[in-house]
Amino acid sequence: MGEPGFFVTGDRAGGRSWCLRRVGMSAGWLLLEDGCEVTVGRGFGVTYQLVSKICPLMISRNHCVLKQNPEGQWTIMDNKSLNGVWLNRARLEPLSVYSIHQGDYIQLGVPLENKENAEYEYEVTEEDWETIYPCLSPKNDQVIEKNKELRTKRKFSLDELAGPGAEGPSNLKSKINKVSCESGQSVKSQGKGEVSSTPSENLDPKLTVLEPSKKTTGAPIYLGFPKVTEVHHEQTASNSSASQRGLQMFKVTMSRILRLKIQMQEKHEAVMNVKKQTQKGNSKKIVQMEQELLDLQSQLCAEQAQQQARVEQLEKTFQEEEQHLQDLEIAQGEEDLRQQLAQALQEHWALMEELNRSKKDFEAIIQAKNKELEQTKEEKEKVQAQKEEVLSHMNDVLENELQCIICSEYFIEAVTLNCAHSFCSYCINEWMKRKIECPICRKDIKSKTYSLVLDNCINKMVNNLSSEVKERRIVLIRERKVKRLF
């Protein structure tokens, strides 16, 4: 969760603040600072970065925005997220602002299969600062800053291995070279019969390296790094042990240099004292002491040269370890990317399978509907054919049985004679003006009977015929009515 201590400020401590309390958890709370816009998502430019461990794509890059309106009321807006923002179990419209109040329930994303609740569920609350800040989630910029500090700490040097106040390898190398030069100058001056004074300040700065912190070992090098494979752990452990051995050799050599320095200073003081006491006395003893001083200086130079070589070797080892750690970081990052890509591909294939299943279901439904449509069409065609057949048969019946033999039209006001033959009322009346006999059987006409049933039947059958036939019949009826009047 990170250390929330950086949230505590002088004016805020002891007050009350609004926050989104993570439901069922005492960590991962989101602080709503007055006057600040709070963005939530899985991208890098948001206030709080939420990366789902179960479904990385559940939270969008910039999922939602929380800010205060001019009245100071906190509001929430869905920033066109893929899986949506839910306020009190109701999904919010994208880019629409909604007010939130104490106790409101906020859900980011949707629950996965076989799960009742979503991964990120919050409750709007206002609590005391002392209650809130131990549970707060670190902001995205603070997480990035902390990661930068961790990467900086990994690039340790001799300065860190030697403890606080120690000097780096480059400074140590230059100062050892300086000591070597000063020692060589002292040897040259003594070869001329002069013993120059060597102040203790010339070598004191190098002595700070002799007090490395016991905590500075190879182990802390790997703090803050992600877990890698066992092979990486073994390689790291071997490199760490090599660094520890090199550090121990470095400390031992510096201790020798310190002892030689002290012996050389004591010998130098002894030579000076002897010279003062016996300026022209025992020159043999002075020469002997100067020779011993030269031997000590030569030994010191040799130790310093060895120390220089060890420093270079240690620097090389540290550089190799640093490069190795960087390679491990790159490999781990690539592995994480491969895992994310594999998971994304798996989700993609699952979605494609679901789409294929849906496609097959839709195709089956469409085929069934097409089959039903074809059957309906066939039935309709059959009904139409039957209807046409009935109409054709009806036309035949009308033409053969219900036509007047005089006018060759369908009966209009049908009249049946005593001989059982039927004619139009107008037609038989006109016929009887010339002859009083049946036009068909030539029997005398004794009676005429109007057939209303036959008229109604003919009218209903004509209604099912074409419009031309119906119009022609109407015209004939009108003409005959007019002729009757005259």
Swiss-Prot record:
Residues 68-72 are annotated as: Required for interaction with PIWIL1. A zinc finger (RING-type) spans 404-442. One of its GO terms (biological process) is negative regulation of transcription elongation by RNA polymerase II. Keywords: Cell cycle, Cell division, Chromatin regulator, Chromosome, Cytoplasm, DNA damage, DNA repair, Metal-binding, Mitosis, Nucleus, Phosphoprotein, Telomere, Transferase, Ubl conjugation, Ubl conjugation pathway, Zinc, Zinc-finger. InterPro entries: FHA_dom (IPR000253), RNF8 (IPR017335), SMAD_FHA_dom_sf (IPR008984), Znf_RING (IPR001841), Znf_RING/FYVE/PHD (IPR013083), Znf_RING_CS (IPR017907). The modification Phosphoserine is found at S157. Pathway: Protein modification; protein ubiquitination. It is an enzyme of class 2 (transferase). Its main location: nucleus. Its EC number is 2.3.2.27. It is found in: Nucleus; Cytoplasm; Midbody; Chromosome, Telomere. It catalyses: S-ubiquitinyl-[E2 ubiquitin-conjugating enzyme]-L-cysteine + [acceptor protein]-L-lysine = [E2 ubiquitin-conjugating enzyme]-L-cysteine + N(6)-ubiquitinyl-[acceptor protein]-L-lysine. GO terms for molecular function: chromatin binding; histone binding; protein homodimerization activity; ubiquitin binding; ubiquitin protein ligase activity; zinc ion binding. The FHA domain specifically recognizes and binds ATM-phosphorylated MDC1 and phosphorylated HERC2. This domain is also required for proper recruitment to DNA damage sites after UV irradiation, ionizing radiation, or treatment with an alkylating agent. E3 ubiquitin-protein ligase that plays a key role in DNA damage signaling via 2 distinct roles: by mediating the 'Lys-63'-linked ubiquitination of histones H2A and H2AX and promoting the recruitment of DNA repair proteins at double-strand breaks (DSBs) sites, and by catalyzing 'Lys-48'-linked ubiquitination to remove target proteins from DNA damage sites. Homodimer. Forms a E2-E3 ubiquitin ligase complex composed of the RNF8 homodimer and a E2 heterodimer of UBE2N and UBE2V2. Interacts with class III E2s, including UBE2E1, UBE2E2, and UBE2E3 and with UBE2N. Interacts with RXRA. Interacts (via FHA domain) with phosphorylated HERC2 (via C-terminus). Interacts with PIWIL1; leading to sequester RNF8 in the cytoplasm. Interacts with WRAP53/TCAB1. This is E3 ubiquitin-protein ligase RNF8. The gene is RNF8.
